[in-house]
């Protein structure tokens, strides 16, 4: 059975890549904990518009964990406290407690300049993905894959890398902030 929670959303507001940004806060009341994080942001925007304020800008597309457009920093973590490998749209309010302060920020990387609020320009990153050449060195002659025994633990860990959807969390979270280190597995 869903419970309702109330909390404070502290969200990033910025008019563009060179504008000075700041945090705004809004009290959210009686939000069902089976609400997705993006649905909660939709409710936030409805409340902001009803009170005559400008809505909070964030990006999203599929809302199914496929595209990665919903990528946000939530409480200092890419995508927030989701299940392993999940995206922001797969985060539900049951991960939060009544009375929490939830901080929402854009990706913090020069490779993702801010368009407005938490919407970032992903075009440089998209070009790397579209180029398809994530590895730029020759690997030589590889043995037949069936001839190399791989322990199950290593195979399971490798599968985590194969689930990449190109959201950019690795680049945003990396202190190097370099999209050139991106090694998407496909």
Task: Locate predicted features.
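Signature of N-terminal electron-transfer/Fe-S-associated modules in redox systems
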Residues: 1-186
């Amino acid at each position: 059975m869903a419970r309702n929670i109330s909390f404070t959303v502290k969200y990033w507001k910025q008019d563009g890549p060179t504008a000075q940004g700041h945090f705004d806060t809004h009290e959210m009341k009686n939000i069902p904990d089976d609400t997705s994080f993006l649905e909660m942001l939709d409710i936030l925007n409805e409340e902001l518009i009803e009170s005559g304020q400008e809505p909070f800008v964030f990006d999203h597309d599929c809302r199914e964990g496929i595209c990665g457009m919903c990528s946000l920093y939530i409480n200092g973590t890419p995508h927030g406290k989701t299940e392993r490998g999940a995206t922001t749209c797969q985060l539900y309010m049951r991960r939060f407690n009544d009375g929490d302060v939830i901080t929402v920020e854009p990706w913090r990387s020069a490779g993702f300049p801010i368009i407005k609020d938490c919407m970032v320009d992903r075009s440089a990153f998209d070009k790397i993905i579209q180029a398809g050449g994530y590895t730029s060195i020759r690997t030589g002659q590889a043995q037949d894959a069936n001839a190399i025994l791989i322990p199950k633990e290593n195979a399971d860990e490798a599968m985590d890398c194969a689930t990449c959807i190109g959201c950019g969390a690795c680049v945003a979270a990396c202190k190097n902030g370099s999209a050139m280190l991106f090694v998407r597995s496909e």
